[in-house]
């Protein structure tokens, strides 16, 4: 469902597959305008009904000649924000449709983007209330966290003639210069047994002077995070497209200061406006959320006007516009979206941040160049089928709210309303 494809690393995108008509119209429109490769073949179809051989025939390629297969199966099945249906949801099986194309095309590399929950998803999801620590029976093998990715990696490794090694990275787009806090899983596989490394973060501080920053043990200096102001501060739209809040919702949001959320409302208004959600123990940070220009934007959702996932402009009482979405995702300024308003928001909100796609594309391009220089000789030492690396993916801006005021802290539990850079570590956690 992303509508912008890797423009980096010297790749030519020769084919794309998309099910949704409006999304395909967006691709066609930008293709006709010369923003995409002139030889791009567009397949408007469900990937489960598409023959890999048909794709090869249309592009004039043979198995093994494709440098990179990139894609992202629907993520709702694995999202920690959803019901974690995993492969019990038919959409979860699209993971194996993706594997079908890998097996048929035999690309040198593949890149899969998904929600971070994919890395911990179970083949058979058991509700938390029924798990062993709640008195339930021990988990079966297919109920264990991570069983989806283990089986997928195992099946990848068994592909005849070119078993794939896969490196799984949990990253945050904000750490690479995107003006958005967006945690994602990036799966990079190759048929040469090469162990691929993802770059260390380049950004990591909400201050303007990198010279002042010594957060990491090696005292490497990071650039400041890109902020919402960097993304949309100069935007002046004459006729914006906006999926706006209702008058009732605007009444509550008008009481919330920039950078705050439901906690800034009087308690009686919290209860009135949130209903049963007010007594929930988690997942409430998006309720009546008003953004701030001074920090990166939270993760974009497909509908910014929901009460529980509000994306309200910092100073105007309205939802973010479509083009503000596009700026935050760093689409080119001349990019065009097609379809109904809801469909256009879905395209922008579901897309991989352009900057993150470029970083991943550059990583793969460098590996392809290195392998070409050694005549595509595979790595003689065979690594494990897969590994998972967490590259400082969980980022906190250290904001909290009390009695209608917004605070930041240096250490959790410190109630002083003073600003401090977040504590962060450079070391990657490997499993």
Task: Label each PLM-derived region with a short phrase.
Residues 1-109, 115-139, 157:
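Core alpha/beta nucleotide-donor-binding catalytic domains of modification enzymes
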Residues 1-12, 155-161, 180, 184-347, ...:
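S-adenosyl-L-methionine-dependent DNA methyltransferase catalytic core
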Residues 76-80, 118-122, 177-181, 195-197, ...:
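Short catalytic/ligand-binding loop motif for oxyanion handling, primarily in non-cytosolic enzymes
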């Amino acid at each position: 469902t992303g509508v912008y494809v890797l423009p980096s690393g010297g790749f030519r995108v020769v084919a794309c597959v998309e099910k949704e008509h409006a999304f395909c119209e967006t691709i066609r429109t930008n293709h006709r305008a010369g923003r995409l490769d002139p030889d791009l073949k567009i397949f408007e179809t469900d990937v489960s009904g598409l023959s890999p051989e048909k794709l090869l025939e249309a592009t004039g390629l043979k198995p093994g000649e494709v440098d990179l297969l990139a894609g992202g199966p629907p993520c709702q099945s694995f999202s920690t924000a959803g019901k974690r249906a995993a492969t019990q949801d038919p959409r979860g099986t699209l993971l194996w449709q993706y594997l079908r194309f890998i097996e048929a095309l035999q690309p040198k590399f593949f890149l899969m983007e998904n929600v971070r929950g994919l890395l911990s998803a179970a083949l058979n999801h058991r509700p938390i209330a029924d798990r062993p620590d709640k008195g339930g029976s021990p988990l079966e093998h297919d109920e264990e966290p991570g069983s989806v990715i283990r089986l997928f990696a195992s099946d990848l490794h068994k592909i005849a003639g070119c078993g794939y090694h896969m490196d799984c990275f949990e990253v945050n787009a904000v750490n690479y210069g995107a003006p958005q806090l967006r945690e994602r899983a990036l799966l990079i596989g190759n048929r040469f047994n090469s162990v691929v490394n993802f770059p260390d973060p380049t950004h990591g501080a909400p201050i303007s002077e990198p010279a002042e920053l010594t957060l990491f043990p090696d005292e490497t200096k990071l650039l400041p995070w890109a902020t919402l102001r960097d993304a949309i501060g100069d935007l002046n739209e004459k006729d914006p497209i906006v999926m706006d809040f209702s008058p009732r919702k605007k009444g509550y949001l008008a009481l919330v200061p920039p950078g705050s959320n439901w906690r800034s409302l009087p308690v009686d208004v919290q209860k009135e406006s949130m209903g049963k959600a007010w007594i929930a123990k988690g997942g409430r940070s998006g309720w009546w959320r008003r953004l701030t220009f001074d920090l990166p934007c939270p993760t974009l959702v497909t509908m910014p006007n929901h009460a529980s996932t509000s994306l309200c402009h910092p100073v105007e009482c309205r939802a973010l516009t479509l083009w503000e979405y596009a700026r935050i995702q760093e689409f080119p300024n001349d990019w065009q979206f097609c379809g109904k308003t809801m469909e256009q928001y879905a395209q922008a909100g579901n897309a991989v941040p352009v900057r993150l796609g470029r970083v991943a594309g550059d990583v793969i391009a460098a590996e392809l160049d290195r392998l070409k220089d050694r005549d595509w000789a595979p790595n003689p030492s065979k690594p494990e089928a897969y590994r998972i690396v967490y590259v400082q993916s969980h980022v906190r801006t250290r904001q909290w709210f009390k009695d209608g005021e917004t605070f930041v802290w240096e250490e959790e539990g410190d109630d002083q309303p003073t600003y401090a850079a977040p504590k962060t570590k450079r070391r990657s956690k490997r499993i």
